[in-house]
Swiss-Prot record:
Assembly, per entry: The RNAP catalytic core consists of 2 alpha, 1 beta, 1 beta' and 1 omega subunit. When a sigma factor is associated with the core the holoenzyme is formed, which can initiate transcription.
Record protein name field: DNA-directed RNA polymerase subunit beta
Protein function: DNA-dependent RNA polymerase catalyzes the transcription of DNA into RNA using the four ribonucleoside triphosphates as substrates.
Alphabetical UniProt keywords: DNA-directed RNA polymerase, Nucleotidyltransferase, Transcription, Transferase
Length: 1226
């Protein structure tokens, strides 16, 4: 690309700094690296996480009779057998073999049998953060789910608080108040009992012990107390049992209220003082005491036995059984797991901070202290104690991300638990002498769960590959649905709504419209996931009113306690906040605070929104609903034949294209030495090694768009034969054979070229003189980009390393003859002629030759009963040639299938013996071009068993044919801008008839001005105006979101370009040459062509398939279905009195089987009268009513009974008759 000068880019951003932007697909790659730990050199020293944790939690496995034990040492990862591209071509899975070193120890002899056991193939993530499963590229979407831990909630209707202990795995424990005012505990939402029973089962056996756990007490005098003092005691509760020392009788139970009778009894007993409960705020809150009265036990043993009898009804209760059951429920790592996250949440909630106590397996189970603190917290909530609040379950501190690594781990745990069961069974069955790890381990359960997860899980999705942005967004998506998540039907408004804790973590704009709104979200640009799975966002730290250069990432929980200034806060030269009062964010409020009270400041205005939303220029002038549509529609833009970067962008385009990994990025510093359409060679610094980069050419994506890479770096070739006369950093001079001097400059714009030849060297025309200097990519440990590598080749929808989803077109906002009514779009014929919005789409067609019972199918050119014309583009093997133009019905691959052998006549046998195979019974089963498809064959892929290709069982040969088609813009295609301004092409008009400007420039596109005010997306107006200035000045603008160009900036550039400040121009009618009455707003707007192409949707049916039960035509283009005539269409026909049309539509054109047969007969014979019969759906209704035991009798207009079976007989007769007559007439 020598000599090509890039457009100058002007950035309006004052604050936005993309250097701190994390690697945009980091969430996928980091999570998978965490799971696999492939880069750990010593395999025996991997951390207890991911795959290693799955092995460690499964092993060791002890045999049921304790005579042997199986231990795990470490796992080994092999190399994938095929490259990602080979996997796509052969419909294989990109996976690596997983092996584990397993030891079987025989206890009696101490013998150790060690083996490396193959554990199956594990799908591997590609460089792009995707998986290739059965040849298709898939993405595992991160799940947003409720974090494990303890949560307190408030039920407004019942005015009660409840607590819920949610583990990562295991039984749920809940505390709440029932209708009788008793604090109850629930296990797994089934078993219900007083909460105090559980507390007593933990070792606090008596009522007094329980009360002392939760309440403080105060001793009050009775002996010698005045009546005034005694009045204060009345109504208060005792903390301990008051016992008559002489008789041993309990006079007053712990928790009982003191009344006048009690006082007189206590005086008689000569009790000097009583110890009374000090309730918080002095409020008597009896829910715990009511539970004590209800539980009916007063020591540990009774409590734990009663607990066991409730949990295991019908089983004998012993102390041992009861203790085991309680341990199993909450205190055993095998059955209960809070996870690191759950423990972290509990510790931060109750401010536990003893690190020794929370290490290893102990940290992941509940402790008695956790249960006691939970009850204490709920009692404080009921007492309205200060600093005790219920949790907000929609707060991002209580919702976490389960990324790909964690999701695969959870699946493997299921598979490994099944493997454990199989191993234990085999240990008891097989002879101890012959047992080895290989024989004991069955890998089928592991393979099954891996295949199930990647193939059919709700979170493993077919990648949206329409364009690079769609791909990038899919990898950054957060899904609240899926296993263990929410369900679409039950999710309410609260969980879908934008929450203040989403700020900087999840985009408040980008979410689907429809039933999934608010459940499927996108990560904000700067957000990252921490080790616990919580989303963090970066802030600049502020100390004593001065903004430091330090950056800190905060979770939603930590952010709660701080005042955070906006990124747009005014800072002086010293870095101090200027104003006396600064607008801040604090929880859900926006208070003004002194600079000294501020601890953090936003990093960039961009950090609120996702990548898609950050690509919308002048977003601040758009309504949120339209911005949502704009974000979503950019992902549907089809990559065009000729890409063009927007005149008005946001600066995010370069980073989005770079991080999507669809461009080829240079790995090491060096110089480009060779460039062609398929390879780029870069010689590394030092000249000892070189890297060769292969480009992907015209491959089909998941959505059928074209994936093609084009080099954008270059070399300098000599244009003459001669000798190099001078070499310097600035230029190379070559003296030709005839003495002419040719000069080559080595600095063009931002591109620097380095000489490859030396002075005095002989060169020929085409010899490489110099290569472009390129920079290698450098990443940090987290995978973030420290130095961006030079982009060597553009991918689809990328222009010179800049994301280019659409084209800049000259637009006017004016109505034109109603052709842009209701958002329709009028476009110029130039757009179609010059392929401005043309795109390439690729379809794949596949055929398999199988082994059948009657013999093998054969791919051949020798197909019976076809003309020579049908074979014109097939090669000698029966496969179409590359470059052939194909239309519907054309043969792509010729194939014959053997027919069933019939009793052969003597004549046939004679012919067979004379002509051999020709007359043999074969059926044409060739692969033909389906209806509605045409194009050019661009590639053929053949696989056969003879060539040792891996094929599915029973398949002998497989051929794939790729057909490409250039699609020009058509009437009916959907187009859109970046501001949610969408419409359908209504008319393609001759260029000379389009309105034109005073200098004679015809418009490219005419949009309806009425689409702007009501939609409130004024961003398109600013974009159009600035776009015109960019076009005139030959530059591009970057206006970052919430930090972009102001009105004054737009005006200044319009002045510089000699454009009117209101961007209104005098336009002339192309048909008459007369000027329009008013001036019209014009400029350059960036328009996308969306994947909703009219050719994929338009469809017509003559006759086709019918539903088996109702006999009505099927629906949809895929089934070659009919058009539904609904209730409202029936009303319309009734209103017009079109009775015959209506009857025809409801009977013979739909499900009147006899009528259909008769009309066919009538058409064949040329008869024009028809008599409709009974629709088949009526018969279905009758049978359904009979199924409900209703006696249905059908009568005609005269009251005579009609038998439907007669009608069916008539249908079958008429069918035979028609068949016979048709053959006869033929």
């Amino acid at each position: 690309m020598y000599g090509q000068v890039e457009r100058k880019r002007v950035n309006f951003g004052k604050i936005t700094n993309l250097d701190y932007l994390p690697n945009l697909i980091q969430i996928q790659k980091r999570s998978f690296d965490w799971f696999l730990q492939a880069d750990v050199k010593d395999e025996t020293k991997r951390k207890h996480q991911g795959l290693e944790a799955v092995f460690r939690e499964t092993f060791p496995i002890e045999s049921p009779n304790n005579d042997m034990i199986m231990e795990y040492s470490h796992y080994i990862l092999g190399e994938p057998k095929r490259s990602p591209q080979e996997c796509k071509d052969t419909d294989a899975t990109f996976a690596m073999p997983l092996k584990a070193v397993i030891r079987l120890i025989i206890k009696e002899t101490g013998e150790i049998r060690e083996q490396t056991v193959y554990m199956g193939d594990l799908p591997v993530m590609t460089e792009q953060g995707t998986f290739i499963i059965n040849g298709a590229e898939r993405v595992v979407v991160s799940q947003l789910h409720r974090s494990p831990g303890i949560f307190f909630s408030y039920d407004m209707e019942r005015d009660v608080f409840s607590a819920r202990v949610i583990p990562y795995r295991g039984s749920w424990l809940e505390f709440e108040m029932d209708n009788k005012g008793i604090l109850i505990a629930k296990i797994d939402r089934k078993k219900k009992f007083p909460a105090t029973l559980l507390i007593k089962s933990l070792g606090h056996g008596t009522n007094e012990e329980v009360l002392r756990l939760f309440y403080s007490s105060k001793k009050e005098k009775i002996a010698g107390a005045t009546s005034k003092d005694l009045k204060k005691i009345l109504g208060r509760r005792t903390i301990n049992d008051i016992i008559n020392m002489e008789t041993g009788e309990v006079m007053l139970e712990a928790g009982s209220k003191v009344n006048e009778d009690n006082i007189s009894i206590l005086k008689e007993m000569k009790v000097k003082e009583v110890e009374l409960i000090e309730f918080p705020k002095g409020k008597d809150n009896p829910i715990l005491i009511n539970a004590l009265e209800k539980d009916g036990v007063n020591d540990y043993e009774d409590a734990i036995l009663k607990f066991h009898s409730l949990m295991r009804q019908g089983e004998p209760s012993t102390i041992e059984n009861a203790t085991t059951e309680l341990t199993r429920l909450f205190f055993s790592p095998k059955t209960f797991d809070l996870g690191e996250v759950g423990r972290y949440k509990i510790n931060s909630k109750f401010e536990f901070n003893n690190p020794k106590e929370f290490s290893g397996e102990k940290a992941r189970v509940l402790r008695p202290a956790d249960i006691i603190e939970t009850v204490r917290y709920i009692l404080n909530l009921f007492s309205e104690t200060e600093n005790y609040y219920p949790d907000d379950i929609d707060h991002l501190g209580n919702r976490r991300i389960r990324s790909v690594g964690e999701l695969i781990s959870n699946q493997l745990k299921t598979g490994f638990s099944r493997v454990e069961r199989v191993i234990k069974e085999r240990m008891t069955v097989q002879e101890i002498e012959t047992q080895t790890p290989q024989l004991l381990i069955s890998i089928k359960p592991i393979t099954a769960v891996i295949n199930e997860f990647f193939g059919s899980s709700q979170l493993s999705q077919f990648m949206d590959q329409t364009n690079p942005l769609a791909e990038l967004t899919h990898k950054r998506r957060l899904n609240a649905l899926g296993p263990g998540g929410l369900s679409r039907d039950r999710a309410g408004m609260e969980v879908r709504d934008v929450h203040y804790s989403h700020y900087g973590r999840m985009c408040p704009i980008e979410t689907p419209e429809g039933p999934n709104i608010g459940l499927i979200l996108s990560m904000s640009s700067y957000a990252r996931v921490n080790d616990y799975g919580f989303l963090e966002t970066p802030y600049r730290t502020v100390k004593n009113g001065k903004v430091t250069g330090q950056i800190e990432h905060l979770t939603a929980d930590k952010e709660e306690y701080h005042y955070i200034a906006q990124a747009s806060g005014v800072i002086d030269e010293k870095g101090e906040l200027k104003n006396k009062l600064i607008s801040t964010r604090h929880r859900g409020d926006f208070p003004f605070r002194n600079p000294s009270e501020i601890q953090y400041m936003d990093l960039a205005p961009l950090q609120v929104v996702s990548v898609s939303t950050a690509l919308i220029p002048f977003l601040e002038h758009d309504d949120a609903n339209r911005a949502l549509m704009g974000s979503n529609m950019q992902r549907q833009a089809v990559p065009l034949l000729r890409e063009e970067a927007p005149f008005v962008g946001t600066g995010m385009e370069t980073r989005a294209a770079y991080d999507s990994r669809i461009c080829i990025v240079n790995k090491h510093d060096g110089v480009v030495t060779s460039v062609d359409a398929e390879t780029i060679v870069v010689e590394r610094k030092g000249g000892k090694e070189s890297d060769t980069y292969s480009l992907t050419k015209f491959k089909k994506t998941n959505q059928g768009t074209c994936f093609n890479q084009k080099p954008i770096v270059g070399v300098v070739h000599s244009e003459i034969n001669g000798k190099v006369s001078k070499v310097s950093k600035e230029k190379i001079e070559v003296t030709g054979e005839n003495g002419e001097l040719k000069e080559y400059v080595l600095q063009i714009g931002s591109k620097q070229y380095a000489p490859i030849v030396s002075s005095g060297e002989e060169v020929k025309r085409g010899t490489t003189l110099a290569g472009q200097v390129v920079v290698g990519e450098k990443l940090d440990e987290m995978g973030n980009i420290l130095v961006k590598g030079t982009v060597l080749a553009d991918g689809p929808a990328v222009d010179n390393g800049v994301l280019a989803l659409g084209r800049n077109v000259l637009a006017a906002f004016m109505p034109w003859e109603g052709y842009n009514f209701e958002d329709a779009i009028l476009i110029s014929e130039r757009i179609v002629r010059d392929d401005v919005f043309s795109s390439i789409h690729i379809e794949e067609f596949e055929i398999q030759a199988r082994e059948t019972k009657l013999g093998p199918e054969q791919i051949t050119r020798d197909i019976p009963n076809l003309s020579d014309k049908a074979f014109r583009d097939l090669d000698e093997t029966g496969v179409i040639r590359i470059g052939a133009e194909v239309k519907p019905g054309d043969i792509l691959v010729g194939m014959v299938t053997p027919k069933g052998e019939t009793d052969l006549t003597p004549e046939y046998k004679l012919l067979h013996s004379i002509f051999g195979e020709k007359a043999k019974d074969v059926r044409d089963s060739s692969l033909r071009m389906p209806n509605g498809f045409e194009g050019t064959v661009i590639d053929i892929k053949r696989f056969s068993r003879e060539n040792q290709d891996e094929l599915p069982a029973g398949v002998e040969e497989m051929v794939k044919v790729f057909v490409a088609r250039k699609r020009k813009l058509l009437v009916g295609d959907k187009m859109a801008g970046r501001h949610g301004n969408k419409g359908v092409v209504a008319r393609v008009m001759a260029e000379e008839d389009m309105p034109y400007m005073e200098d004679g420039t015809p418009l490219d596109i005419v949009l309806n001005p009425l689409g702007v005010p009501s939609r409130m997306n004024l961003g398109q107006i600013f974009e159009t105006q600035l776009g015109f200035a960019a076009s005139k000045l030959g530059i591009s603008f970057e206006t970052p979101v919430f930090d972009g160009a102001e009105e004054s900036d737009v005006d200044n550039f319009c002045k510089e370009a000699n454009l009117p400040l209101n961007s209104k121009f005098k336009l002339y009618d192309g048909r008459t040459g007369l000027p329009f009455m008013n001036e019209v707003f014009c400029g350059y707007i960036y328009i996308l062509k969306l994947a909703h192409l009219v050719e994929d949707k338009i469809h017509a049916r003559s006759t086709g398939p019918y539903s088996l039960v109702t006999q009505q035509p099927l629906g949809g283009k895929a089934q070659f279905g009919g058009q539904r005539l609904g209730e409202m269409e029936v009303w319309a026909l009734e209103a017009y009195g079109a009775s015959h049309t209506l009857q025809e539509l409801l009977t013979i054109k739909s499900d009147d089987m006899l009528g259909r047969a008769r009309i066919y007969e009538a058409i064949v014979k040329g008869i024009h009268s028809i008599k409709p019969g009974i629709p088949e759906s009526f018969n279905v209704l009758v049978q359904e009513l009979r199924g409900l035991a209703l006696d249905i009798i059908i009568t005609d207009s005269e009251g005579n009974t009609v038998d439907i079976s007669d009608y069916e007989d008539e249908y079958s007769k008429s069918k035979k008759k028609i068949k016979f007559e048709t053959i006869e007439n033929a």
